[in-house]
Amino acid sequence: MRSLWPVWYYALNRISRRRWRDYKQSVRLTPVQARVLNDLKQDGIAITHIDEFFARSDLGHAIINASARIMQDPESEKKILAHERETHAAKSDIIVHLLGGYGDTKPSLKLTDPFLRFTLSSEILDVVSSYMDMFTFFKMCSLHSTILLPSGSRATFSQRWHRDPDDKKLVKVFLYASDVEDEGAGPFTYVKGSQLRGRWRDIYPQIPPVGSYPPEGGVERIIPSDDRMQAFGKTGTLIFCDTSGLHKGGFSTTKRRLMYAATFTSGASALAANYVFTDPQEAVQLPAIARYAISQNI
């Protein structure tokens, strides 16, 4: 019921659309933001780099440095190695969450945290809200590493083609904190045009709160290779993506992939936040678009 267009658009997102309509009068997208938005609308995915997207701030490099510090912690390496042993033995998930938040302790974020500063920046939120045409809620964040798998391993969990169940339209922002320049590094892969209103939207559709996992080989039989996009890039590559579209994570067979991810949904989503905002009294200093993004978690 929540995902029916009249309910989703006119009822559940009425307030967030009105707030955005008033706020966007003051928004001026840079040429890079405008290009990202255009690609996101056309294909459901847009790729840029922090050096051009955050050309006037250090937010991109701050989160890369913070990710590197976490990865260099001996406890992180111990956690990844333990997960690799478990996965090879029991076929558990192929991702290790280094900030918590997935069956673990929720990440505790405050305004000085580089992960939150990045996520709530006007650079990010202005693009996300422009695509969604409404204020959005910041629901989930994760810094995660893939584990190394033997070549030829069978796809499991997020390595399989799927559509996220969380909303009929949503945005995930991915930041590569390591080089992902070949298939062995586990590139993110997306079917261009599988987002809402896209040309491949009706192929293996999701009906929130239920996603979709196509049968093995099903996507390849229907979708031409030109529309199955692998996102390669150096450290600092930034991906905006509507993950209600068909997508999958990659196999890391030669090198682990370190990536930060942030999820933004509409007010229709029943997805609970996976982080804790530790200084809610400080939220008053944020712009309206950022206050709204964390308002469900204050």
Regions found by a protein language model. Give the residues of each.
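Non-heme Fe(II)-dependent double-stranded beta-helix
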Residues: 2-43, 49-159
